[in-house]
């Protein structure tokens, strides 16, 4: 790096500076090594564990550091015994610019064509000030969020969790834990108890699908005119107002068609494994996985399903043919107070121009997913922990030794044979029912639009995209209240209608103005795209330490990867356009 800037939260002693400026990673590490060993030192960087960390450590150093991670994300690296590197993006789930006014990024930082790109000697005081402002924004965001979190959980010295989902869950537990899930012991201590059959949770786990995203039939890659996109305000928080399965009151039910219809009539939560048959004129919307991708247009269903979608299916053209497994539960309002309190708080903050409303938004949107946290296999990469494990006589019964690469030259790491990391917050029937309710809400609005003659081209979790509306108004409940719908406009635009749009596939579409200029490009997984999937596009990323270790390459290096759509890329068409 050209330089690194660090700002302490505050000056803890008279010799501490307000900011530290380092010209290389070695200088910063030398400073870190002199920090008092009797304290914990936590360093935050935004998206830091995928980018900034490589300014300090090489591939092997990162491999050898103890870490907290899931298969795709490192939440924390530990350096020595008392220094921790955490990624603020896991708490502040938006670009840093969302939390404060940033300046314009100097071109020499990001543009390889700039004559000063990579030239350390070209760094000016203005460049340093740009980065200083970044660090100020991050420091203020983290300290403000921590103060709010301490207030919400009622603990003066509470430290921030690693992720926004964990933060939301702890706030919910501290303020809204159901009293019926707690009891007092003979010693006067309050104990919290949740117990359920794992078999019931596993069934719901198989019914846990994400948001529905699709281009509607015969419209993929077709240019449509006068497009409009409507988003539902706070889709998941709005659905969390409903009743959900009570984990302490889960029972196995007689797996029969008659029992399902009785549970449906009673309006209680239930789930199971079902076989359904589509009838003519019925709605096609049930989730399935086909070729490892979500598919919503099947005319038969055989799998796990939660009660919101099954109830809707039975009311809209589907017949229940067989019940293979059935669970029921008593309903409980788990989140109503939580959602209403924080939604009202956010509205009040927005009304007063209080920027802290962004943190409340994070809290509202992050909670439900925590109940769907997956079990994970423990992965140990650092030599010290591996050595301790392998000194045990029976370590091979618990762990599998895996090579970093096929030639075994890059070393080994350990993976537990069983999923040993089991989140205590996990209860899949809740998470699966919330997402099921959201998909039903989406489908009911799509069906209403289609019934009234509107053309639906695309949907994504909480949004519906229409085209060629004419003067008709779609049947959404328009407004700014929780659960109402609102019109999405391109950034910086006041127009209601997008003159032309092309939807290629999930998470990939382009909006254009009347002059053919692109006003919005959505292309997931591709950072540098012009929105035309018939051409090769470029994704710019940073090589992570795992990839570097496997391939024997340098970590932290910018990588340009050519991305070609399997469905849309056409070499001949590209040649024609060039000629």
Positions of predicted regions on the chain:
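Conserved acidic
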Residues: 2-579
């Amino acid at each position: 790096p050209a330089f690194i800037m660090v700002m302490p939260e505050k000056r803890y002693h008279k010799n501490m500076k307000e900011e530290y400026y380092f010209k290389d990673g070695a200088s910063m590490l030398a400073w870190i090594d002199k920090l008092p060993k009797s304290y914990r030192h936590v360093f935050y960087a935004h998206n830091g564990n995928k980018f900034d960390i490589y300014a300090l450590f090489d591939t092997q150093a990162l491999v050898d550091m103890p870490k907290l991670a899931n298969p795709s994300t490192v939440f924390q690296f530990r350096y020595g015994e008392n220094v921790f590197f955490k990624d603020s993006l896991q708490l502040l789930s938006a670009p840093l610019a969302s939390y404060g006014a940033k300046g314009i990024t100097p071109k020499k930082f990001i543009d390889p064509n700039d004559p000063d790109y990579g030239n350390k000697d070209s760094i000016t005081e203005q460049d340093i000030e740009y980065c200083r402002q970044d660090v100020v924004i991050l420091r203020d965001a983290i300290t403000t969020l921590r103060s709010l979190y301490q207030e919400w959980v009622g603990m003066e010295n509470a430290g921030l969790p690693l992720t926004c989902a964990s933060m939301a869950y702890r706030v919910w537990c501290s303020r809204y834990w159901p009293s019926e899930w707690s009891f007092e012991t003979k010693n006067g201590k309050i104990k919290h108890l949740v117990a359920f059959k794992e078999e019931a949770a596993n069934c719901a786990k198989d019914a846990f699908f994400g948001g529905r995203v699709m281009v509607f039939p015969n419209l993929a890659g077709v240019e449509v005119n006068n497009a409009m996109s409507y988003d539902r305000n706070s889709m998941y928080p709005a659905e969390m107002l409903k009743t959900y399965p009570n984990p302490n009151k889960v029972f196995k039910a007689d797996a029969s068609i008659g029992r399902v219809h009785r549970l449906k009539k009673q309006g209680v939560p239930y789930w199971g494994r079902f076989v359904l048959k589509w009838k003519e004129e019925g709605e096609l919307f049930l989730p399935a996985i086909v070729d490892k991708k979500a598919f919503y247009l099947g005319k038969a269903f055989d799998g796990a399903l939660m009660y919101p979608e099954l109830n809707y299916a039975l009311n809209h053209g589907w017949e229940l043919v067989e019940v293979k497994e059935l669970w029921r539960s008593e309903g409980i309002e788990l989140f109503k107070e939580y959602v209403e309190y924080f939604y009202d708080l956010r509205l009040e903050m927005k009304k007063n121009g209080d920027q802290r409303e962004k943190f409340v938004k994070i809290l509202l949107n992050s909670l439900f997913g925590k109940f769907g946290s997956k079990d994970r296999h423990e992965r140990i990469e650092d030599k010290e922990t591996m050595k301790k494990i392998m000194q045990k006589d029976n370590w091979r019964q618990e762990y599998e030794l895996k090579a970093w690469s096929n030639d075994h030259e890059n070393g080994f790491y350990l993976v537990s044979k069983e999923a040993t990391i089991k989140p205590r917050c996990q209860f899949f029937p809740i998470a699966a029912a919330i997402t099921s309710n959201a998909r039903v809400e989406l489908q009911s609005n799509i069906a209403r639009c289609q019934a009234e003659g509107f053309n639906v081209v695309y949907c994504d979790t909480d949004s519906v995209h229409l085209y060629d509306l004419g003067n008709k108004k779609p049947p959404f409940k328009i407004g700014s209240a929780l659960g109402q719908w609102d019109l999405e406009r391109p950034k910086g635009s006041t127009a209601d209608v997008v003159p032309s749009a092309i939807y290629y596939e999930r998470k990939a579409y382009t909006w254009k103005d009347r002059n053919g200029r692109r006003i919005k490009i959505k292309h997931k997984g591709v950072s540098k795209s012009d929105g035309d999937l018939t051409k090769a596009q470029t994704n710019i990323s940073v090589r992570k330490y795992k990839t570097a270790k496997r391939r024997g390459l340098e970590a932290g290096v910018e990588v340009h990867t050519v991305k070609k759509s399997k469905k849309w890329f056409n070499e001949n068409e590209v040649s024609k356009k060039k000629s």
